């Protein structure tokens, strides 16, 4: 009777920033003959392209919202219930290792794995480690980060940390093979406006006004592809219709990697996944970090790309139609600068991260190369 290949359980929060790196690692592990499953919350089913429903286990979890006794009790109850379910999963599936990618849905499976002595690893894509991963960091077997130096201030954590980069989905790797072509003097200028997998209202508030300020000389050149929440769709469409723009609006783009590859300039939030994908593909960007985050992780993420020369970072308080119009106008008049930004961003990217992380996972799980080929 042929032995089954080892199972690697991947745990990720239900947004694209957590899920897409898990998908990329899943592809790399499956190519090595390993089995994979995903533990997450219900949101992930919308974004996942790799994991079919029968490869996904949904466990209850709760993001901590507020410090009131009621909020704390609700979070504790949900996470406790999720951990009991995760313990049952560990008993039934017996994974060789459990790998977390951040977000509160990773807590139950990682804690359950630790209770059973199953090897564990967390991967963090941010320049500042997220709260769930930080909570788990002292408990897990190993840590992987996208950027160097994230945990240098804690020698105990630094000793078990490996810098791998952010794993990229096959669609991103395909988009990275498309070279950047600067816009011609009178040719189309392709703008891509996104706000993360959950959208961003600030883009609907600011971008239409900025484009209107660019004036009629530039409007005919613009090709605007914008992610817009359903509740903001009508007002954004009304502005672009009035300006007679060439535009496309959607609440979510399933083919975002191809859209990134086709763009001359990306206007976006600066979640870790977005920044890593922009660097991998090499596209100029204007990044607007999400304000109010406890750790200012998006501000730090955007700083990595802006310091490399691949992006312009604008704090949300400064992100006005006038400021954005000035930046777009200056870039539209200077194609050579767009080319330089694309090259600088690409220089900050890493395309082999999924394989590097897969190497680490196999090592942590104690899987031999011979064992990993079992089906």
UniProtKB/Swiss-Prot annotation:
Functional pathway: Cell wall biogenesis; peptidoglycan biosynthesis
Gene coding for it: murG
Disulphide-bridged cysteine pairs: none
Job of this protein: Cell wall formation. Catalyzes the transfer of a GlcNAc subunit on undecaprenyl-pyrophosphoryl-MurNAc-pentapeptide (lipid intermediate I) to form undecaprenyl-pyrophosphoryl-MurNAc-(pentapeptide)GlcNAc (lipid intermediate II).
Enzyme class: transferase
Organism: Rhodopseudomonas palustris (strain BisB18)
EC identifiers of the protein: 2.4.1.227
One BP annotation, GO: carbohydrate metabolic process
Family of this protein: Belongs to the glycosyltransferase 28 family. MurG subfamily.
Binding annotation for UDP-N-acetyl-alpha-D-glucosamine: 15-17, 126, 169, 197, 298
Protein name: UDP-N-acetylglucosamine--N-acetylmuramyl-(pentapeptide) pyrophosphoryl-undecaprenol N-acetylglucosamine transferase
Entry superkingdom: Bacteria
Pfam families linked: Glyco_tran_28_C, Glyco_transf_28
Membrane disposition: Peripheral membrane protein
Compartmental location: Cell inner membrane
């Amino acid at each position: 009777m042929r032995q089954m290949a080892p199972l690697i359980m991947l745990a990720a929060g239900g947004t694209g920033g957590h899920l897409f790196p898990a998908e990329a690692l899943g592809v790399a592990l499956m190519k090595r003959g390993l089995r994979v499953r995903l533990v997450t919350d219900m949101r992930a089913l919308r974004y996942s392209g790799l994991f079919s429903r029968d490869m996904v286990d949904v466990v209850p979890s709760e993001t901590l919202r507020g410090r009131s006794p009621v909020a704390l009790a609700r979070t504790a109850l949900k996470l406790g219930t999720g951990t009991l379910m995760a313990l049952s999963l560990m008993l039934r599936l017996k994974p060789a290792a459990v790998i977390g990618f951040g977000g509160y849905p990773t807590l139950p499976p990682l804690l359950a794995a630790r209770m059973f002595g199953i090897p564990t690893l967390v991967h963090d894509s941010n320049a500042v480690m997220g709260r769930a991963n930080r909570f788990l960091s002292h408990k897990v077997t190993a840590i992987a980060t996208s950027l160097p130096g994230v945990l240098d201030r804690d020698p105990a954590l630094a000793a078990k940390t490996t810098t791998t980069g952010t794993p990229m989905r096959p669609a991103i790797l395909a988009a990275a093979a498309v070279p950047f072509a600067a816009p011609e003097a009178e040719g189309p200028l392709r703008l891509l406006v996104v706000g993360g997998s959950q959208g961003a209202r600030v883009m609907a508030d600011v971008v239409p006004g900025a484009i209107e300020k660019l004036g009629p000389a530039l409007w005919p050149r613009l090709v605007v592809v914008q992610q817009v929440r359903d509740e903001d769709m009508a007002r954004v469409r009304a502005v672009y219709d009035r300006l007679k723009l060439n535009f496309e609006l959607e609440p979510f783009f399933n083919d975002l990697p191809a859209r990134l590859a086709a763009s001359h300039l990306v206007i976006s939030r600066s979640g870790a996944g977005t920044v890593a994908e922009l660097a991998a593909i090499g596209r100029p960007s204007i990044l607007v970090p999400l304000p109010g985050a406890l750790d200012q992780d998006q501000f730090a993420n955007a700083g990595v790309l802006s310091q490399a020369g691949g992006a312009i970072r604008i704090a949300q308080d400064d992100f006005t139609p006038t400021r954005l119009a000035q930046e777009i106008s200056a870039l539209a008049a200077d194609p050579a600068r767009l080319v330089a930004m694309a090259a600088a961003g690409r220089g900050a990217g890493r395309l082999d991260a999924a394989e590097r992380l897969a190497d680490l996972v196999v090592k942590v799980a104690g899987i031999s190369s011979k064992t990993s080929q079992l089906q």
